[in-house]
Amino acid sequence: MRIVIASLQYHPDAPSGSARLAYDEAVYLAGLGHEVWLVARDGSGRQPEYEEKDGLRLLRYPPVVSRGADPSRFSLHQDQTRRVLETHLRETPDCLHGHALLQFAGALSLYGGTVRTCYSIHSPAQLELLAGAVGAGWARKLPLYPRAAALHVLERRCLKRSASITAFSLYTRDLVRKLHGAHVAERVQVISGWANMAQFAMPIDREAGRSRLGWPTGVPVLFTVRRLVPRMGLERLLRALHGVQAAGRRFHLVVAGDGPQKPALQRLAGDLGLLSSVQFAGSVDEDALSRMYAAASAFVLPTAALECFGLIAVEAMATGSPVLATPTGAIPEVVGGIEPQWLARDNSPDAIRDLLIRFLDGSLPGHRPEDVRAYAERRFSRTHRVADLAAAVLGAQAPVA
């Protein structure tokens, strides 16, 4: 079969949770002998428009230039997706699978009605847009509402035209029910996201791993990796740690990732007297990320809003690390299955503080690292889950090339 997968970006270019799942699916299908085309934006503007790589035929379109609040940028992404497909893919595909709304809508306008169409909803588009303004004032929020409404209409249209709809958590399906109605939600098949267990090894000696990373030894090291934007809850984590420090507990926090909130977070860490206990590591590659998960005493996931799966929690558990998290979105589905007490009572700084103090005091239930990894492998192994997604996309009667 000839399959087109529409993604926000090509994961090796710009790693993210949704791009990872789209990439893994594409590589899996190509490994079965299918002809797989992956179309995505090129955020850097430096990649070739057409390239064959990883067994895939990659189509990348250049950055879309428009003002942030300009609603025309939505149609520009769709137009560019359609253009690169028309330019390079001369034969009609058999199947179209979307992992990103605008790119899927662009491809759907080209092939809809003639091919099998499937959509995986990683996060409802209007909520994703509005979540970017968590904690912001009304001056920033108000211009987003017309854009969010436009995305909502487009998403509903794409869902209606999809023969198969999947989501990566029960939480996401519940959001679909609230936003688009029960008649749409009942069509959504929940297939959990996954991690590549082979990429994440159980550490032999966490202290030695910290030393190799230049992290302090002899003190509990908390680790998180996030895009540094308000909805990720890092401001709340810093305020929680201020309370942990005031309570006399020792710790060191490493924050990997980058984003527009970084300067404000660094200033806040200074204002709270945390500079000696908090390290901003910046962007890290996947090899370094695996070593960081494995070296940490615990992984912290302080999400403030809209966590529709939580891939990084699964990756951390694949190294045997406990995950201390807020009960936001789908996180309880991922973390609660191994230990409900690893979840804070809510996503407030006080609740996060209390959870961290309990961990540092050794009063939370403990699990052997081997058991934590076994849980992650049983529930979220790429080997099984990507095959489930591919089956849903291709359909029960779809021929294998």
Residue ranges and their predicted role:
Residues R67-G68, V115-R156, L175, A198:
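Acceptor-binding helix/loop patch of EC 2.4 sugar-transfer enzymes
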Residues G98-Q103, I121:
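Short His-centered aromatic/hydrophobic patch
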Residues T166, P216-M232, L238-L241:
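Conserved donor-binding/catalytic core segment of Leloir-type glycosyltransferases
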Residues Y171, W194:
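Carbohydrate-associated surface elements
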Residues S283-V284, R291-A296:
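Short alpha-helical donor nucleotide-sugar binding micro-motif in glycosyltransferases
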Residues A313, P322-A325:
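Short hydrophobic beta-strand element within catalytic cores of glycosyltransferases
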Residues G337-D350, I357-L364:
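Conserved acidic donor-binding segment of nucleotide-sugar-dependent glycosyltransferases
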